[in-house]
Amino acid sequence: MESQQLSQHSPISHGSACASVTSKEVHTNQDPLDVSASKTEECEKASTKANSQQTTTPASSAVPENPHHASPQPASVPPPQNGPYPQQCMMTQNQANPSGWSFYGHPSMIPYTPYQMSPMYFPPGPQSQFPQYPSSVGTPLSTPSPESGNTFTDSSSADSDMTSTKKYVRPPPMLTSPNDFPNWVKTYIKFLQNSNLGGIIPTVNGKPVRQITDDELTFLYNTFQIFAPSQFLPTWVKDILSVDYTDIMKILSKSIEKMQSDTQEANDIVTLANLQYNGSTPADAFETKVTNIIDRLNNNGIHINNKVACQLIMRGLSGEYKFLRYTRHRHLNMTVAELFLDIHAIYEEQQGSRNSKPNYRRNLSDEKNDSRSYTNTTKPKVIARNPQKTNNSKSKTARAHNVSTSNNSPSTDNDSISKSTTEPIQLNNKHDLHLGQELTESTVNHTNHSDDELPGHLLLDSGASRTLIRSAHHIHSASSNPDINVVDAQKRNIPINAIGDLQFHFQDNTKTSIKVLHTPNIAYDLLSLNELAAVDITACFTKNVLERSDGTVLAPIVKYGDFYWVSKKYLLPSNISVPTINNVHTSESTRKYPYPFIHRMLAHANAQTIRYSLKNNTITYFNESDVDWSSAIDYQCPDCLIGKSTKHRHIKGSRLKYQNSYEPFQYLHTDIFGPVHNLPKSAPSYFISFTDETTKFRWVYPLHDRREDSILDVFTTILAFIKNQFQASVLVIQMDRGSEYTNRTLHKFLEKNGITPCYTTTADSRAHGVAERLNRTLLDDCRTQLQCSGLPNHLWFSAIEFSTIVRNSLASPKSKKSARQHAGLAGLDISTLLPFGQPVIVNDHNPNSKIHPRGIPGYALHPSRNSYGYIIYLPSLKKTVDTTNYVILQGKESRLDQFNYDALTFDEDLNRLTASYQSFIASNEIQQSDDLNIESDHDFQSDIELHPEQPRNVLSKAVSPTDSTPPSTHTEDSKRVSKTNIRAPREVDPNISESNILPSKKRSSTPQISNIESTGSGGMHKLNVPLLAPMSQSNTHESSHASKSKDFRHSDSYSENETNHTNVPISSTGGTNNKTVPQISDQETEKRIIHRSPSIDASPPENNSSHNIVPIKTPTTVSEQNTEESIIADLPLPDLPPESPTEFPDPFKELPPINSHQTNSSLGGIGDSNAYTTINSKKRSLEDNETEIKVSRDTWNTKNMRSLEPPRSKKRIHLIAAVKAVKSIKPIRTTLRYDEAITYNKDIKEKEKYIEAYHKEVNQLLKMKTWDTDEYYDRKEIDPKRVINSMFIFNKKRDGTHKARFVARGDIQHPDTYDSGMQSNTVHHYALMTSLSLALDNNYYITQLDISSAYLYADIKEELYIRPPPHLGMNDKLIRLKKSLYGLKQSGANWYETIKSYLIKQCGMEEVRGWSCVFKNSQVTICLFVDDMILFSKDLNANKKIITTLKKQYDTKIINLGESDNEIQYDILGLEIKYQRGKYMKLGMENSLTEKIPKLNVPLNPKGRKLSAPGQPGLYIDQDELEIDEDEYKEKVHEMQKLIGLASYVGYKFRFDLLYYINTLAQHILFPSRQVLDMTYELIQFMWDTRDKQLIWHKNKPTEPDNKLVAISDASYGNQPYYKSQIGNIYLLNGKVIGGKSTKASLTCTSTTEAEIHAISESVPLLNNLSYLIQELNKKPIIKGLLTDSRSTISIIKSTNEEKFRNRFFGTKAMRLRDEVSGNNLYVYYIETKKNIADVMTKPLPIKTFKLLTNKWIH
């Protein structure tokens, strides 16, 4: 190995002449055989001067036989007699040749040199002979020698002859690499020419000028063997020599041929780099020229990839073709064929040949099958390694080693193309060669084998970030199973067995070490230059050594193949073997606590803080040595990474120094955090924190609001606590300037107590760093604890309190003490602490029955402040309890489906840690069992009503120790607890009703039920969320009901009369009235429901069923009966056929009960198997006679029985709770880009229309002076954030016109370039529908206008710049905007302000307050939607007058004047309107749907029949885990967005009958299961089948003196996910449906009455706003009415009872409704359920019912 290293450096010892030739480069345009004559003469002069001092002495030697080139040698051949050859680099020719010279030329007598390093050779002896020039050639050779007297001559020669014939010839350099052979052979040919052997060199045709002699052939062979060692020969040369080892002529001939080819390649590259095209020649000729060049280069092994080729072509484009540089340069995957398609398109436009396509045009689809490929598709992914500095040779291409980092070569850009064309182009592929470099087999396949490794050496790798070796015998201090992830360049993981140190002992006797990873899965042993640099060792590739920064040489570098290596002899061996590394373990007897366990135990604090705390005994029970800290440095807690993710560290040292002078508890910092949204109402939304400046002791207090009295209570509490506990007085409290601190109440309190408030200055957050950082730290801990435990978010303050307890006990690295120690308190006993969310089993000391389980699964939160117990959360009871009666659940971490903390189990560690405390608990069990106040152990902190999602598996058999359990058996029993999985509850519904995690004022073991009906019907759980309501039949035998259960322990709250009604079934979530089921009288209901507080479900005391109407207020001017008839008379209600009286059986005898089998029912923990119901409710029938969907009783019962089971938890969160609006739904893209509309548009006619529209838009932009044309700005001079990207979009309008629009990319506009406070208003859809309805009733003329390029009339205030349009060809310039270009964020607001000002000042209009874009005067009403105007007037001349005024300022186009008395068709904002003045108006979208629906790729009419309803009643959406891959998931979500987007657009325009289905499916956009997609397809199919349906309006009777505005309301109780109710409202003006709304209730209702109140309260605000709009547009009096089918709701609104409602949310709504009715002349009436057309908004209906409710207003 050492000989190889020395020999590899030996070429450096050549003379300067040799070095100069070696470094000489041949110019790309120069003859490859031409060498500078001046350089040759200079070398010859130096050689002559040196040779003139030589003398000759005879000598002889025997040449050993070469075993590699062995051939028979005649025995009679004597050895040649030649002088010694002391220097192998130079040669000398004697005056006359010896007689035996010809024998020297025998192949078996070839001399050898030390440069032949192959093991097949042996070193030459000191008498090795050098080949001599043949005597037949007249010009001798001579070589100077640096040693005098060491020349060799023939015995027959004379000094005079030698002197007269001496000439110096420079020898060729030594070949050192196969890649250098093309350059070397040039110098060798020049050597032969200088030796007067130019006649034997083959010419271009492969034949020499003259015949070569035997002596010349021998000389040729010998010199070739000396200066071209066999190991450095290319593969093709070796192949020639393997056939005939003396055929040097063939090698020369082929080399010259390759050189000529290289010259052609150089010319091709120069031509390609200097392409010029401006359209003066045919485009196909230009394409043929370029593709021929690329094909030649590809065939010669020089692959020009598509990116380089396209850039070279685009660089040469000029004239009309120049803009292709700017439109195509960003296309990363553009091909040459695609680029030429653009060139052909422009050439066609120039030549005017658009009628027919030329033959040379190719489709893009054909390009894929083209035999010519410009992309190297077989290129492997490699790492470009270039360990040399920038002034060294080019980088080598290596195989993809297993390393974690790779350096990618920079991509070619325009700058690289613009370099001198004489320089060779650097390509990014190992087949992309420099000019003159030969593409050989060695070049292509050298790195595809593992035999290119140099044994006993480490490969130097600049791309690797870590050092890796395959053998463990050099690893010191090894440790197994390191937590290190290593990937190779292909992003594949490399398994790591161990990590240790690699120690070096260099030749200067210095030692150093670096980290090393052990793995057998790599091809080479890799030595990272990055890690060497870290220990001050660098690689110098000019000297080929490793050296320090001071220049000290440490070791040589060997270049072998394409890589650089360093010998392993410098590594110090170790005694560790592979089995030792793979079997490192810890003895069980000395097993320490793993750091991940301690990290989690101590609230996820960092390792440094924990170690400080253990060293200073702030954490007791065990020492620092009891923890295994080996993984602390590299350990990454995934929960900490998620929960504590932050931007950057806070700024340190921001506090004032004088604060350190205060005594403990004299200077406090305080701050408020919050609010936390989407929590139950009793969970705290805020917390206030206090930090003592001196001790850093922290306090936290929960807050529900930030009112003055709440803050004052907390201040009073903490001041009293500090005064009594620490005998200290607070002097200063530092706080921010929030209103909660600066109010007068708190200021007086602080002044009264002598406390100085210290407020921060404005925007000085640094001065408040202590409190701010504490809140951030606590919030980080909170997120981490919740993430780790999986507990619901409403327990967030428990996590805050747990973190505060722990952090008060952890030592500060600065003070070396904890806050508790500073305050004089004892340290925290960790044996009393449990991990947050630790599963436990709590003993139930007061079970319902003696046979019931005594153990309740729970989750530990934090130690109690008020006792020695622990605060534990019980999901099944929805409680938090303070107790010591618990057992730690073994084998369970808190987050069962998440991180396993490196597969570590902490059960044994937790048992050891809490052993003493568990014994303490067990010893106190008997004493506590005799305590009379044992109930106080379950002092419930809250009645948290969670989303009733039970744990995945309930521990039905888990029993905690009973009261009689001996202390000695307590621990043993805990070990026998069932191992069934207990899952922490998921996130609760944010709108869940009351919960309280604070100690309740009145302790109660059972919750009170104020309303049996609502409680019993409000807590049912469903396994599957229903999309559609359950089905029912008209007769009682086919009806199915869900039972409601009641616990025996609550039976005392009912009267004895109720016992006769046990096991009475009630309906499920429907909760609506049905005539087929007899009504229960109010008196009978009152008998059943007693001892109840007033509730919103109370039935009316008086019965008004004789008229089915319950008026709320009797006006003084209009009679109640007349008002009722007036409101209902014109409504499009269905006509019901008369019903014959029917006898019904007693429902309490005929309907069978359905009992729950859940131990803890879904009714909030109330009830068991002995459940009974207390009240009956009614259901609607599915359909009176027939239906297309037949569902059997068994099927219906099966689906509804699942409603009694707890819902399953979901692994994948792809189901959103609700979509209240359609703003998030992506619209379908209907526009085209420039390349789609023009460049690649195959429709010639359409293309011409788009080109015409393009030029029209450009002319309009110039006409409007959109930008400043006087000055163009350089891109480098403008702030990039003020530069707005622009583009052209094209679309085809519904009237068939083609439109082009130049728009700005406002979606990427910088926020600093517009005022976010400005609003872009458009007319509300309800305002448009109201205006249209009033126009029909008042015989108005309707005129439709359009203002061309509306936005361009509005000036822009900001300084913005855009890139010029493509046709200008100025990509490097910018132009300043002067007008509001379409797409800018501020354009809409600017135009709105401009047109608003003009309409008010010039047209005499005024905007209706509260209704933007609705303008009116005494004669005309205008609805404005961007650039569309709709004018309404009874006098057409008034409209014409407005038009004339508008045309003075704006380019106004009349779309439809509306002067005809016949039917007029409009297209207004997507609505296709047919209007005959004074008769009717029809609104539809048939043409639009006919065009758009087929483009959705939905299979229409798959069964060849039309649907009669949009959905199926009784169908549930199965919400089990959605198992699809990510690509398919994204594709289906995108499809759902398109389908629901179109359906929403149509539904909210006029198809109000579809809103329930649209809203429900919109909630499942992110859950695109097969079932959801099928139901969506069914909805789209129904829209397609009914696309001709129209919303029908008829003119109101002229005798009507008033406008009647009515809202019909309905609610479907509990039929949505999380037991939310669906509410719906329909709005009618003078009997015409003008709008509708269907949505999920934002609050969880507990009864049908609450749902109905919620629905009505949602309709009132819009009803009042519409009333104001109608009165502004039409001066007639208006009557407002509300219709509902809920008698109890009407009774509540009518009632004057001021007693407290059961639920304050719905009580507030009910009281507001009372105020609305009493103050706004709002009439509320009852409507029969079968006539309630709002029913279609809340639930799926049978076909007959659906048709009956909708056929009067949409058909």
Swiss-Prot record:
<dbReference type="InterPro" id="IPR013103">
    <property type="entry name" value="RVT_2"/>
</dbReference>
<feature type="binding site">
    <location>
        <position position="1685"/>
    </location>
    <ligand>
        <name>Mg(2+) 3</name>
    </ligand>
</feature>
<dbReference type="GO" id="GO:0005737">
    <property type="term" value="C:cytoplasm"/>
</dbReference>
<feature type="site" description="Cleavage; by Ty1 protease">
    <location>
        <begin position="401"/>
        <end position="402"/>
    </location>
</feature>
<comment type="function">
    <text>Capsid protein (CA) is the structural component of the virus-like particle (VLP), forming the shell that encapsulates the retrotransposons dimeric RNA genome. The particles are assembled from trimer-clustered units and there are holes in the capsid shells that allow for the diffusion of macromolecules. CA also has nucleocapsid-like chaperone activity, promoting primer tRNA(i)-Met annealing to the multipartite primer-binding site (PBS), dimerization of Ty1 RNA and initiation of reverse transcription.</text>
</comment>
<keyword id="KW-0233">DNA recombination</keyword>
<feature type="compositionally biased region" description="Polar residues">
    <location>
        <begin position="1054"/>
        <end position="1082"/>
    </location>
</feature>
<dbReference type="GO" id="GO:0003677">
    <property type="term" value="F:DNA binding"/>
</dbReference>
<dbReference type="GO" id="GO:0003964">
    <property type="term" value="F:RNA-directed DNA polymerase activity"/>
</dbReference>
<dbReference type="GO" id="GO:0006310">
    <property type="term" value="P:DNA recombination"/>
</dbReference>
<keyword id="KW-0814">Transposable element</keyword>
<feature type="compositionally biased region" description="Low complexity">
    <location>
        <begin position="960"/>
        <end position="969"/>
    </location>
</feature>
<dbReference type="GO" id="GO:0015074">
    <property type="term" value="P:DNA integration"/>
</dbReference>
<dbReference type="Pfam" id="PF07727">
    <property type="entry name" value="RVT_2"/>
</dbReference>
<feature type="compositionally biased region" description="Low complexity">
    <location>
        <begin position="153"/>
        <end position="165"/>
    </location>
</feature>
<dbReference type="GO" id="GO:0005634">
    <property type="term" value="C:nucleus"/>
</dbReference>
<keyword id="KW-0963">Cytoplasm</keyword>
<dbReference type="GO" id="GO:0003887">
    <property type="term" value="F:DNA-directed DNA polymerase activity"/>
</dbReference>
<feature type="compositionally biased region" description="Polar residues">
    <location>
        <begin position="48"/>
        <end position="60"/>
    </location>
</feature>
<feature type="modified residue" description="Phosphoserine">
    <location>
        <position position="416"/>
    </location>
</feature>
<dbReference type="InterPro" id="IPR001969">
    <property type="entry name" value="Aspartic_peptidase_AS"/>
</dbReference>
<dbReference type="Pfam" id="PF00665">
    <property type="entry name" value="rve"/>
</dbReference>
<feature type="compositionally biased region" description="Polar residues">
    <location>
        <begin position="127"/>
        <end position="152"/>
    </location>
</feature>
<dbReference type="GO" id="GO:0004523">
    <property type="term" value="F:RNA-DNA hybrid ribonuclease activity"/>
</dbReference>
<dbReference type="GO" id="GO:0008270">
    <property type="term" value="F:zinc ion binding"/>
</dbReference>
<feature type="compositionally biased region" description="Low complexity">
    <location>
        <begin position="402"/>
        <end position="418"/>
    </location>
</feature>
<feature type="binding site">
    <location>
        <position position="1428"/>
    </location>
    <ligand>
        <name>Mg(2+) 2</name>
    </ligand>
</feature>
<feature type="binding site">
    <location>
        <position position="1652"/>
    </location>
    <ligand>
        <name>Mg(2+) 3</name>
    </ligand>
</feature>
<feature type="region of interest" description="Disordered">
    <location>
        <begin position="352"/>
        <end position="421"/>
    </location>
</feature>
<keyword id="KW-0255">Endonuclease</keyword>
<feature type="binding site">
    <location>
        <position position="1427"/>
    </location>
    <ligand>
        <name>Mg(2+) 2</name>
    </ligand>
</feature>
<dbReference type="InterPro" id="IPR001584">
    <property type="entry name" value="Integrase_cat-core"/>
</dbReference>
<feature type="region of interest" description="Disordered">
    <location>
        <begin position="1"/>
        <end position="93"/>
    </location>
</feature>
<comment type="function">
    <text>The aspartyl protease (PR) mediates the proteolytic cleavages of the Gag and Gag-Pol polyproteins after assembly of the VLP.</text>
</comment>
<dbReference type="InterPro" id="IPR036397">
    <property type="entry name" value="RNaseH_sf"/>
</dbReference>
<feature type="region of interest" description="Disordered">
    <location>
        <begin position="956"/>
        <end position="1087"/>
    </location>
</feature>
<feature type="binding site">
    <location>
        <position position="1346"/>
    </location>
    <ligand>
        <name>Mg(2+) 2</name>
    </ligand>
</feature>
<dbReference type="GO" id="GO:0006508">
    <property type="term" value="P:proteolysis"/>
</dbReference>
<feature type="active site" description="For protease activity; shared with dimeric partner">
    <location>
        <position position="461"/>
    </location>
</feature>
<feature type="domain" description="Integrase catalytic">
    <location>
        <begin position="660"/>
        <end position="835"/>
    </location>
</feature>
<feature type="region of interest" description="RNA-binding">
    <location>
        <begin position="299"/>
        <end position="401"/>
    </location>
</feature>
<dbReference type="InterPro" id="IPR039537">
    <property type="entry name" value="Retrotran_Ty1/copia-like"/>
</dbReference>
